[in-house]
């Protein structure tokens, strides 16, 4: 069957519906998701972003080395209409500042290992900062929006 997907969001929602009970990915102990579970985690994160004023078409930074939750972060952004701003782990503090400032990013997913490289003045502007490692909230700013 041929599909004419126009967006990653369409692919995501189709896959969650069609393959719900199948494994989406497996990574070591405790990080195994069926498509259903993967979709649930992404929806919860998306709702968390919405609760902090991150709406469709808003930009969300993604600054993390490769890890299983990188894909969770990515799809919690793009599958619900937001725009991902991916950043290379080799970027300097000034480059991180420039990218997040010029993109007008309102939220950030960042690994705990790289968190200290994000300039404080940028962190203060973020509505919410989420760790890609365990998807915990590292910082939330109700007054940012």
What are the roles of these predicted feature ranges?
Residues 1-4, 37, 84-87:
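Short, flexible loop segments at the rims of nucleotide/cofactor-binding pockets, characterized by
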Residues 52, 79-145:
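Structural core segment of the AMP-binding/adenylate-forming
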Residues 8:
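Short recognition helix of helix-turn-helix/winged-helix DNA-binding domains
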Residues 4-5, 13, 21-67, 71-75, ...:
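Conserved AMP-binding/adenylate-forming core of the ANL superfamily
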């Amino acid at each position: 069957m041929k599909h004419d997907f126009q967006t990653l969001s369409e692919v995501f929602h189709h896959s969650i519906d069609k393959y719900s009970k199948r494994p989406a990915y497996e990574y070591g102990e405790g990080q195994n998701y069926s498509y259903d579970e993967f979709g649930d985690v992404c929806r919860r994160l998306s709702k968390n972003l919405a609760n902090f004023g991150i709406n469709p078409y808003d930009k969300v930074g993604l600054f993390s080395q490769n890890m299983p939750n990188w894909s969770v972060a990515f799809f919690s952004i793009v599958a619900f209409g937001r725009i991902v701003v991916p950043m290379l782990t080799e970027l300097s503090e000034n480059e991180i500042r420039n990218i997040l400032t010029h993109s007008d990013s309102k939220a950030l997913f960042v690994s705990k290992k790289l968190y200290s490289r994000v300039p404080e003045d940028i962190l203060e502007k973020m509505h919410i900062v989420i760790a890609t490692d365990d998807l915990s909230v590292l910082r939330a700013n109700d007054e940012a929006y």
